[in-house]
């Protein structure tokens, strides 16, 4: 809990869970940047322009449908477990995108659609496990501010990867790797909570 005057950045900086939450948010946010390259990934896989453009729609469908159940799933399974499972679904989407087949990239885009809600839905629920009330508002504002600054270069880098390699495989791979790191951070956060309860 923060001091009476409220939670300060200095006190947050002394909490290891702050860095877990910040980096988990950052990794989830960076993974969502792949969304803007989905049409190009479809063209790379040999889809005609009309079908490739549909990949963004498929991702949006995955995005909207996942938002409907993530909150409920968190109530049933807990925020940590739901966060972990959601990342795994996104990773399956990444693998399907990497396969580069017309059918696989369409299915991959649908499953990838769960990625944006990782930062917009699951990260706030994750933070609420560590901070309550006004402390949560303060902590989450710092998490989002620093997390966004940390990964903002990936907006440019994801495009540069294609310029360097002539393929979106590296972009998809780096996005997937960032989510693997996010999964490890979420797991570590869950472990920290369990240890705290036992203490």
Task: For each feature predicted by the language model, list its residue ranges.
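Paired small-residue
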Residues: 103-111
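Loop-to-transmembrane helix entry/capping segments in MFS-fold secondary transporters
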Residues: 49-50, 133-143
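Extracytoplasmic gate region of multi-pass secondary transporters
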Residues: 13-70, 154
């Amino acid at each position: 809990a923060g001091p009476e005057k409220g939670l300060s950045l200095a006190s947050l900086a002394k909490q290891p869970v702050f860095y877990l939450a910040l980096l988990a948010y950052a990794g989830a946010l960076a993974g969502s940047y792949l969304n803007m390259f989905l049409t190009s990934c479809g063209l790379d896989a040999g889809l005609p322009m009309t079908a490739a453009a549909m990949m963004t729609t498929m991702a949006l469908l995955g995005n909207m449908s996942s938002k409907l159940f993530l909150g409920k799933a968190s109530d049933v399974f807990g925020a940590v477990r739901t966060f972990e499972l959601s990342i795994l679904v996104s990773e399956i989407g990444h693998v399907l995108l990497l396969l580069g087949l017309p059918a696989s990239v369409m299915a991959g885009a649908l499953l990838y659609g769960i990625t944006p809600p990782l930062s917009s839905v699951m990260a706030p629920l994750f933070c609420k496990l560590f901070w309550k009330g006004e402390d949560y508002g303060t902590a989450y504002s710092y998490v989002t501010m620093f997390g966004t600054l940390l990964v903002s270069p990936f907006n440019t880098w994801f495009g540069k990867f294609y310029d360097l390699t002539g393929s979106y495989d590296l972009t998809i791979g780096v996005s997937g790797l960032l989510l693997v790191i996010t999964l490890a951070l979420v797991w570590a956060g869950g472990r920290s909570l369990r240890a705290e309860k036992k203490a």
